[in-house]
Amino acid sequence: MSDDYKAYLERAQRTLRQPVDAIFERIRAIIGPANMPSSEQGRLAQQALDAMRAMQRPSPQQLAALEYVIRLMRPAPLSRSGSLDTLDRDFSDIFTDWKTFQESVKPYLYSVGRIDSLSTRKSVGTGFLVAETLLATNRHVLDQLSCGTNELEQGQAVVRFGQEHSTPDTLGIVNILRVVALHDSLDMALLEIEKPNDATPAEPLTVETSAARDGDAVVAVGYPFDDPTRNPLFIQALFGGKFGVKRAAPGEVVKISAQSVFHDCSTLGGNSGSPIFSMKTARVVGIHRDGFFMFRNEAVDGASLAQFIDQHV
């Protein structure tokens, strides 16, 4: 069996510590029977595990089912009043550093904001502070904000750092003033914003230049929104129907390649531009840029992001 399959098996075993049938029962209790995948998916996933443990190659259908089950074990806790929700025991047993991360990330949660277009009155993505008035996001987020011109004027867009579920946004809106820089080849942009008011406890995020490693626990923080045309049914239940508000999404690094970090956090549309934190250090190891739910999620790596920021600070 190839090293890739061995790594996949290790990832699956870190997540699925019981037979798949037992995992399905736990998930059914969380999201309800109507939102569950078919029992056939569970059978195929168990076959994939059994095959890899026997040093055999599973079929593509079996692997797809196994990936589906792994993603069922990737929660999306809410941020409330500047703190992340505690994970249910079913998930905290997987992400053993979560409690420490809840504390270490607190100074940075109000530095992650939802980017809204004032012309369309829609949110288009996520951004985060890398300096007092400098916001990092994706180039394609800027493309949506600027209608493809890659230029912004005051009054076109704002960022909201306090948009949380069931918590009044006392921080208000912050105007985005202009485009500072676009990366030539990577999906990154830097935007200048107004200085957040003194009531905003905003601390610029620290970017890690050392490469993340396969299997590292990571967390995407951003503002996922609903997309009924792309999201499976269980997403509505897993997210409790609450979209467009600040959430964390724990997962792990699946693969590292040149200037990219592939991860399996539960990111949706709206997470574009989200910081990918190391769960151990609360440092940013990437900026989320793209994803296909249940297939792959991709971020630009921290070293490339740090170099880009250094050129413009």
Segments and roles (model prediction):
Residues 1-125, 245-248:
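Protease-domain processing segments flanking chymotrypsin-fold serine proteases, especially trypsin-like
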Residues 2-18, 22, 26, 33, ...:
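C-terminal subregion of chymotrypsin/trypsin-like serine protease catalytic domains
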Residues 13, 18, 41, 46-47, ...:
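Residue-identity detector for glutamine
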Residues 23, 27-31, 70, 94, ...:
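Weak global preference for isoleucine
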Residues 83, 87-98, 208-212, 274, ...:
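Short, solvent-exposed coil/turn linker segments
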Residues 103-124, 128-269, 277-280, 297-303:
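Serine endopeptidase catalytic core focused on the charge-relay Asp
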